[in-house]
């Protein structure tokens, strides 16, 4: 089987590559988004813009994998080829941007979903999924790191069956909810006059604390951003 893998996540790329020794007889080609400055082109890992590819390119692969790709897969691709997404959320809850951020805020379950893609965002029948515990001391970075580790664990466990076609497609349990980048951007600006409980403030800050990124901020008297984060430690 010839597999086309799209990822913009270095941790997932490196971890997935370590699994490949188990899959002799299959060919894996790796691509990332051209605007991703974190990567350098190499023989094994090349920039490629999906929407500019021809039908001949799509037809040359048996399976397309999206592993934290920043590109939307074209309708022509997902409607005519097997495309599978590894999504860092528990579909149908918090589809879209940064599922773990919104799980901290709205209390919906978080986890990992491997699903067949369709033309909607983070949508389609489910192959495998696992829920992860969201702890009171978790920041976005804490739970996200566990999600990434779980993704690699699930890929190792289920990739043989995926390549062999040994899986069952289960419809999503409803449409759930979806969050967009604009929703996240609105969360980042803190209004110091907004009324909230201590619990709501703590949850907002831990949802937006994700080193090395500076997300939460308020504006000072000069209109300059002052960035805010939170450190949490559970007693032993």
Predicted feature locations:
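One-carbon transfer enzymes
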Residues: 1-236
């Amino acid at each position: 089987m010839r597999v086309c893998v799209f990822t913009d996540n270095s941790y997932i790329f490196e971890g997935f590559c370590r699994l490949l020794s188990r899959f002799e007889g299959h060919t894996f080609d790796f691509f990332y988004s051209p605007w991703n400055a974190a990567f350098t082109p190499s023989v094994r890992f090349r920039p490629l813009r999906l929407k500019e590819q021809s039908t001949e390119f799509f037809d040359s692969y048996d399976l397309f994998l999206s592993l934290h790709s920043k590109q939307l897969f074209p309708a022509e691709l997902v409607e005519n080829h097997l495309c599978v997404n590894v999504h860092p959320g528990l579909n149908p809850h918090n589809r879209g941007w940064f599922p773990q951020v919104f799980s901290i805020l709205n209390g919906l379950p978080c986890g990992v979903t491997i699903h067949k893609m369709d033309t909607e965002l983070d949508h389609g029948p489910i192959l495998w999924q696992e829920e992860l515990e969201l702890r009171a001391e978790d920041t976005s970075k804490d739970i996200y790191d566990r999600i990434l580790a779980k993704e690699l664990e699930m890929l190792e466990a289920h990739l043989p069956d995926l390549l062999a076609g040994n899986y069952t497609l289960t419809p999503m349990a409803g449409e759930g909810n979806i969050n967009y980048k604009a929703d996240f951007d609105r969360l980042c600006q803190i209004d110091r006059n907004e009324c909230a409980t201590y619990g709501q403030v703590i949850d907002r800050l831990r949802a937006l604390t994700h080193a090395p990124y500076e997300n939460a901020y308020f504006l000072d008297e000069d209109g300059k951003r002052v960035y805010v984060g939170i450190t949490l430690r559970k007693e032993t």
